[in-house]
Amino acid sequence: KYDMDKNDFILVDGNHNLSHNFVVDWDPYLYRPLGDKIGWEYYKKFLFQENDNKLKTKKFLCMNGSFHPHRVVLLNDLYTNNCLEDSYYSNNFGGEKFYNWAKVQIKIDWNEIWEDVELEKDFWIGNKKKLDGADDINQRLLNPHIKYFEDSYFSVVTETWFNNKTPDDLVKEYPNTPLKITEKTYGGLLFHPFIVLGCPYTLKYLRGLGFKTFPEFFDESYDMIEDVRERYEAVLENIIRLNKKSLEELKEIYDSVYDKILYNQRLFHDWDRDKLVSDLYEKIMEKTK
């Protein structure tokens, strides 16, 4: 319409399937790196705390601020498997109107994946469940509500993107691998052992950056599963298995890996965030030549 040349623009985004999601072939484009600067000064004050060795009252933390089908299905399955009573969880979507819409819409949008899913009416027609503002993205970036991390043993991170496949050859070079990883993942990474309901190869990418993951808690083979439903089932199985453990059993595992949490905090803390921005700027300038 405006006779603009696409080569006059460089789109910076975290969507590794961007070229498949738009009619226009957006090329070239760059990827936003993990560890953006937003909210970092507020996170720093909560780092490097000694393990208080207290018995926590909840097993895991799972925050769900906005609607995505995989979040609805996971919460639904956690409810039917009695996993939510001993957790801090939230869903900013619910009520009878939402239930009537979602039970149809999920199968329309993702029929090939969730065709057999039946939402539990008693759970979804209830009130939305919030964690004192922890699900508001602006509040969360300014204040991670550390109390929920301090009183639970691991995080279930429900990432924004889930129904995606990332070819293995894209995860060989670090740290510029095009994966959709948001503040949800690095929030969990900073304070907890964590499992991610997100894109395949997320853990592989994080390990490539130097972070430690937690096979002591989870069967992390789920990270390599490209089939969406199979990856989902593997994540769900992990959570159900851990939920069957007592708080005392989880504490024993948690205490044994606490040094890993501190290590991840140190690595994240020591990143040169100004360099992340300057490197991205240099790549943009290089593409304009």
Predicted segments, located by residue:
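Pol beta-like nucleotidyltransferase catalytic core
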Residues: K1-V156, N163-T182, Y186-L190, I195-K289
